[in-house]
Amino acid sequence: MSASSLLDKQCDHFSTKIVDLIMVDKADELDRRVAAAFSEREASRERRISQISGECNAGLACKRLADGRFPEISAGQRVAVLSAYIYVGEEILRWILEPEASVRTRVSGLVAIDLAPSCMDISRAQLLQTMNLLSGKRCAPSDLSHFVAISISETARSRTLQMAPYEEGSLKSVTGFTVIIEEAVPFDMVAYGRNLMLKASAGSFPTIDLLYDYRLFLDKCSDSGRIGFFPEDVPRPKVAVIGAGISGLVVASELLHAGVDDVTIYEAGDRVGGKLWSHAFKDAPGVVAEMGAMRFPPAASCLFFFLERYGLSSMRPFPNPGTVDTDLVYEGCRYMWKAGQQPPKLFHRVYSGWHAFLKDGFLEGDIVLASPDAITEALKSGDIRRAHDSWQIWLNRFGRESFSSAIERIFLGTHPPGGETWSFPHDWDLFKLMGIGSGGFGPVFESGFTEILRLVINGYEENQRMCSEGISELPRRIASQVVNGVSVSQRIRHVQVRAIEKEKTKIKIRLKSGISELYDKVVVTSGLANIQLRHCLTCDTTIFRAPVNQAVDNSHMTGSSKLFLLTERKFWFDHMLPSCVLMDGFAKAVYCLDYEPQDPNGKGLVLISYTWEDDSHKLLAVPDKKERLCLLRDAISKSFPVFAQHLVPACADYDQNVVQHDWLTDENAGGRFKLNRRGEDFYSEELFFQALDTTNDTGVYLAGCSCSFTGGWVEGAIQTACNAVCAIIHNCGGILAKDNPLKHPWKRYNYRNRN
């Protein structure tokens, strides 16, 4: 039976027609009018049933009532009728209501659920997650733009899921009913209209562990140009900032704008920027090798605030796997992955499974954990309670899982996302190679699962960009700004700080030269290894509480190595070779980078080796960059000789046109970035909130990405810099801008509560 015939059949049996609510755009009005439509339908049906049963000796068993057109009647007995909603896209809705005669496609297996389109407790992403799990299909957000309200018999085939969380951690039951539009089934269409459930809004949004939008705070402060200020009668503090990375420079700059004139920055190295380090080549000034941070997602909204402030808006996509032509090398065989398409067949199961996980979350028994996409949408739509409760459930259930054990639990269990159970070790190894969007994650498989998941939820794996002018241009421009006649860079002293100690009400800085100086406040951004070993801040509880000391001493810093090669030409364009190569051998990840797209004859840049952890540690045995390059080139040539033959430095100059760096042996870094092991999220909490702890203020404040929830990302460095600045202004009698992080009513998580 066609949809139009079904609609006609319904109209023949009772006078109430399906109600058009397309123009209703307010949730409360939609709720009221849908309820009215159901009430009118129920009254009309009751009159019709009474009429037919009264005319027939068989009563409720009358054949006219048992033909499947009345949801209230089953086997001659009255049954309950439930309200449910079919969610469809605009095209399918139009097909259901006004089909053309030529359309014969069967619309079957549609699922109706008991969640109303006016429900504000459920987001579109959660609806999508629920529909995918109940229907077993892959719905897109556009497939849920409209609804058809139906009355359906309680005898209809159904399945119930428990959505976690709901209202401060409780569960919400969601029941789905399978319906077939073209058959006489026990349901009636009552009304149709637009889905008004919450959907994500544009603009910045808070990170999942903080639920506070630092970008919004910075935007609000833009008009005045400062985070806070000091009244004329309040003395300004004398402040030392340890480290001239992005965090230290933001601290110094914001303090100067707030009116703190006596600011000194101590930097142990010979450059500014810390891990924002762009190496420029003599033979190609417009080409830069990003030795530290190199991928910048728009979701890192604080970073983009400062990029825009200092006129660095030129960005282009980073050539991540699958976004450009990519070769995947597995067990000596090459598999080509065309840009924007599905990966090779060998990788379909892990690729589809991971992307299903992002949309559908994880079904454990009959309890559904919110999908990463649903949590992100809750953040974007301002549904902070939903985001908090959803993330707390993940922390409770997976906080003690490593990335490795969580992948095993999710994809090798009874309800794997995508419907296909992964095999071990085959799919396991494929996933290690392919990764989650930005390359293979095999080397960090033993890090905490929630440490990786938060990056996904925060949007840091999406739409990653590279900075055309080199990211170190940002710290350079911050350092070059002049405040009260003196540039920030003039306040930098390139000398190593050996110790930071309390001396009565002051903080004493002891320098490598033997000189000591006293300050009112000190902000330490120099990294965890220096805080523990050089500054000796964790020897006792004079400066920091014991839990903070423990976090500094025990947080895991990741080793990372990079080797860049400047080539005579952009050979990958000349010879139609892939811009990205992922390998399961020694080389791991190769990226071809074009910093001068306007010049097709310009120099090329290849990141021939970007490795983490054990893969990086092995390279430390080969410190000579020419020897290391030769080993990498030989490894690549075994499976991809056509590509490897072009890996020769421009002008055969290995000294100038090959650069490498090992962050683990960098004496001023002690590792590339903090990456928590399983069960160690509470370390990040201790480090991040240290500066905001007004009850334990000693005058020394931590900042930097390693003291945040997002180690290795510029966002965490800026967030903690804001914390330190606010703490100093507030604790020294200054006045902060409204809605600042110090006065924010933080909704904290329980990182130690494990089920």
From Swiss-Prot:
One matching Pfam family: RolB_RolC
Gene Ontology biological-process annotations: auxin biosynthetic process
Pathway, per record: Plant hormone metabolism; auxin biosynthesis
Catalyzed reaction equations: L-tryptophan + O2 = indole-3-acetamide + CO2 + H2O
Essential cofactor(s): FMN
Binding-site positions, substrate: 295
Cofactor binding note from Swiss-Prot or TrEMBL: Binds 1 FMN per subunit.
Positions with a binding annotation for FMN: 247, 267, 275, 295
Alphabetized UniProt keyword annotations: Auxin biosynthesis, Crown gall tumor, Flavoprotein, FMN, Monooxygenase, Oxidoreductase, Plasmid
Documented EC number(s): 1.13.12.3
InterPro entries cross-referenced by the UniProt entry: Amino_oxidase (IPR002937), FAD/NAD-bd_sf (IPR036188), Flavin_monoamine_oxidase (IPR050281), Glycosidase (IPR006064), Trp_2-mOase (IPR012142)
Domain of life of the organism encoding this protein: Bacteria
Single GO term (MF): tryptophan 2-monooxygenase activity
Keyword Cytoplasm in record: no
Family, similarity comment: Belongs to the tryptophan 2-monooxygenase family.
UniProt name for this protein: Tryptophan 2-monooxygenase
Species this protein is from: Agrobacterium vitis
